[in-house]
């Protein structure tokens, strides 16, 4: 398995619709102001956070159970900036829709701009032939409220291509998050 370059990422996005919308360069400024960068980098793609959020709350004082998750544990929010309460988290989604080729697996890492502020971005790998908007998890590890900016970079996707196609892809096995739109809660 080898990591793929900016040239490969551009070709796959432009000719095969792997990333939509796609930014072929690196954007660091918008409307004359500095932003958290997004777009194609040397060996990855910096994804953006959309303006849809689900902010975790303990209003219902329930037990967090990934097999039986209570939707009422979240407050829906739409806006350019999301404030995550101290020691809490929020879910969001990418602005980009992904179509992962059968021979490719991705790994996604949070951007250091957020990590250096105690905000951790977690995303699981995008498996071969998975497609959809990516659900993002932002953890505020600090004792203070934390800001997340919609429309700006939040994590980097690295693309790895195998020497041979997998026997069974995510699509083949009917993965539960295939084709997801919006912020998707846990499913079992």
From Swiss-Prot:
Reactions catalysed: dCTP + H2O + H(+) = dUTP + NH4(+)
A single GO molecular function term of this UniProt record: dCTP deaminase activity
Entry binding sites for dCTP: 111-116, 135-137, 156, 170, 180
Active-site residues (renumbered): 137
Keywords: Hydrolase, Nucleotide metabolism, Nucleotide-binding
Signal peptide start-end: none
InterPro entries named among the record's database cross-references: dCTP_deaminase, dUTPase-like_sf, dUTPase_trimeric
GO process terms (BP): dUMP biosynthetic process; dUTP biosynthetic process; nucleobase-containing small molecule interconversion
Pfam families in UniProt: DCD
Tagged with keyword Hydrolase: yes
Taxonomy, superkingdom: Bacteria
Broad EC category: hydrolase
E.C. code: 3.5.4.13
Functional pathway: Pyrimidine metabolism; dUMP biosynthesis; dUMP from dCTP (dUTP route): step 1/2
Family in the record: Belongs to the dCTP deaminase family.
Assembly, per entry: Homotrimer.
HAMAP family hit by this protein: dCTP_deaminase
Function of the protein: Catalyzes the deamination of dCTP to dUTP.
Protein name as it appears in the record: dCTP deaminase
Annotated source species: Ralstonia nicotianae (strain ATCC BAA-1114 / GMI1000) (Ralstonia solanacearum)
């Amino acid at each position: 398995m080898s990591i793929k370059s900016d040239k490969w990422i551009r070709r796959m996005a432009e000719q095969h619709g792997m990333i939509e919308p796609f930014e072929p360069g690196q954007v660091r400024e918008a409307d004359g102001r500095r932003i958290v960068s997004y777009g194609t980098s040397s060996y990855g793609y910096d994804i953006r956070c959309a303006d849809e959020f689900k902010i975790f709350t303990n209003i219902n004082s329930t037990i967090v159970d990934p097999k039986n998750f209570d939707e009422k544990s979240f407050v829906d929010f739409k806006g350019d900036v999301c404030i995550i309460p101290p020691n809490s988290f929020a879910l969001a989604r990418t602005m980009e829709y992904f179509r992962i080729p059968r021979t490719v697996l991705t790994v996604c890492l949070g951007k250091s701009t957020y990590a250096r502020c105690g905000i951790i971005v977690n995303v699981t790998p995008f498996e071969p032939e998975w497609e959809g908007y990516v659900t993002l998890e932002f953890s505020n590890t600090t004792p203070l409220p934390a800001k997340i900016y919609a429309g700006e970079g939040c994590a980097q996707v690295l693309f790895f291509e195998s020497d041979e196609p997998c026997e069974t892809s995510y699509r083949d096995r009917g993965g539960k998050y295939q084709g997801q739109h919006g912020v998707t809660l846990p499913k079992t």
